[in-house]
Amino acid sequence: MTTVTVIGAGPTGLTAAVELARLGAKVRIFEKRDGASNLSRAVGITPGSIELLTPCGAGPAIEAEAIRFEGLTVHRGDHPVLSLPLNFDARSSLHGLPQDRTEAHLIDALARYGVQVEYNRELTNLHIEADRVTACFGRHIEVPSKYLIGADGAHSRVRSTLGIHFLGHDLPGRWSIADVHSASWPHKTRFSGYLLPKGHVCVVVPMAPDRYRVIADADDALKALPVPMEVDQVHRTGSFTIQVRQAEQYRKGAVFLAGDAAHVHSPVGGRGMNLGIADAADLARRIMDGTTQGYDEARYAEGEHVIQISERGRRMLQSKGAAKRALFATMSVISHTPPAQRAIVHQLLSG
């Protein structure tokens, strides 16, 4: 029986573990946290991710609980300058669900295959031999397996232990975030973007009924929002910086990188979690059918493509002055035709 160790129990690691278990591997999954996360980093779930998670049973459960986004609108002040539908066919039916709920559905699916996440296990070392990889946790716990998957995030211990460089750069400035409850916010199922002076931007993303995420490249996301929002409850606030990086390789011997351990980029477009899910599903299939030699090249190319799209979108949102006005004026005109709408939305959601 094929044995696999998975390091990291976010969406990427959980997807890898459940797909491997479904396909017949003996899998163990380890997480350094002391339990399942109650925080939500990602929200958007593409049709492709739901399709990939359908065989294990998590996809339909996620789709049933998630909200379905109707569209996105970009404003200058309170005036819309661009509007796109996101629900005119199944190919573009983007859903939204807090990441902790997505993880909960994956954990439930994993349990149906008899696998539990092993918490409070932080990787300390790896030993790679010709026929196995041994993961070390502390001084006394060693877990051998034929393959190991590093799905342990942007600060991956697996990646650093392998000596794989994480090439790229940090973007200047900090972004802020606020997850809030607002019963009166009118845009229940639409992304609402606001173009602010000096190239700044603020976005409101629906997460669940009456729950929203406000994101801005400013010190205080709620203060940056240029239109009134009556907030009933603040669930959390925080700040973050953006890295644009990619591992120089996704594989070293029988050890593989997936998700944020392999690539990170701006949240524009909501592609990060979905890219990690796709990495994991592809890798699980390749491990079980013996085609792992193609993983590095294929997923590196897809990661590079998503980084390029994400950066193009971020630069567009943060461009300044006349260039931005001309760009959105042009997009506003072409986006009124259904073929153009489909092309734009498919570019946003593909992969």
Predicted regions and their residues:
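Core beta-strand elements of the Rossmann-like FAD/NAD(P) dinucleotide-binding domain
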Residues: 139-147
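Glycine-rich FAD pyrophosphate-binding loop
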Residues: 21-41
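A conserved short coil-to-beta-strand element within the FAD-binding core of flavoproteins
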Residues: 119-133
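Conserved mid-domain beta->alpha element of the FAD-binding
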Residues: 11-18, 106, 150, 240-313
